[in-house]
Amino acid sequence: MSAVRIKKGDTVKVIAGKDKGKEGKVLSVNAKNHTALVEGVNMVTKHAKPSAANQQGGILHQEAPIDISNIAYSLKGKETKIGYDFKDGKKVRVAKATGEVID
């Protein structure tokens, strides 16, 4: 598998699956499983029993992980691939479409 170039806090766009076209912020990335949690994308319904933390219990709606291959980095509303470059002796992420430094 290739390296995961998406990081927590990035804005991404879903390019495949039931939520195709939606944009959201990455909440977490799991490089081992090649998945990411994206805010408001791939919502699932979970039934929770009452517990000390959740007195009420009931039906919860939460994000489920989505495969990294189904999302693309979104720069100003357009998808772009991410590359790496060295600027001032530091390795930085670069948008391949525009050449703009991401972080």
UniProtKB/Swiss-Prot annotation:
<dbReference type="GO" id="GO:0005840">
    <property type="term" value="C:ribosome"/>
</dbReference>
<dbReference type="InterPro" id="IPR008991">
    <property type="entry name" value="Translation_prot_SH3-like_sf"/>
</dbReference>
<dbReference type="GO" id="GO:0006412">
    <property type="term" value="P:translation"/>
</dbReference>
<keyword id="KW-0689">Ribosomal protein</keyword>
<comment type="function">
    <text>One of the proteins that surrounds the polypeptide exit tunnel on the outside of the subunit.</text>
</comment>
<dbReference type="Pfam" id="PF17136">
    <property type="entry name" value="ribosomal_L24"/>
</dbReference>
<dbReference type="InterPro" id="IPR041988">
    <property type="entry name" value="Ribosomal_uL24_KOW"/>
</dbReference>
<protein>
    <recommendedName>
        <fullName>Large ribosomal subunit protein uL24</fullName>
    </recommendedName>
</protein>
<comment type="subunit">
    <text>Part of the 50S ribosomal subunit.</text>
</comment>
<comment type="similarity">
    <text>Belongs to the universal ribosomal protein uL24 family.</text>
</comment>
<keyword id="KW-0699">rRNA-binding</keyword>
<keyword id="KW-0687">Ribonucleoprotein</keyword>
<dbReference type="InterPro" id="IPR005825">
    <property type="entry name" value="Ribosomal_uL24_CS"/>
</dbReference>
<keyword id="KW-0694">RNA-binding</keyword>
<dbReference type="InterPro" id="IPR014722">
    <property type="entry name" value="Rib_uL2_dom2"/>
</dbReference>
<dbReference type="InterPro" id="IPR003256">
    <property type="entry name" value="Ribosomal_uL24"/>
</dbReference>
<comment type="function">
    <text>One of two assembly initiator proteins, it binds directly to the 5'-end of the 23S rRNA, where it nucleates assembly of the 50S subunit.</text>
</comment>
<dbReference type="GO" id="GO:0019843">
    <property type="term" value="F:rRNA binding"/>
</dbReference>
<dbReference type="InterPro" id="IPR005824">
    <property type="entry name" value="KOW"/>
</dbReference>
<dbReference type="GO" id="GO:1990904">
    <property type="term" value="C:ribonucleoprotein complex"/>
</dbReference>
<dbReference type="Pfam" id="PF00467">
    <property type="entry name" value="KOW"/>
</dbReference>
<dbReference type="GO" id="GO:0003735">
    <property type="term" value="F:structural constituent of ribosome"/>
</dbReference>
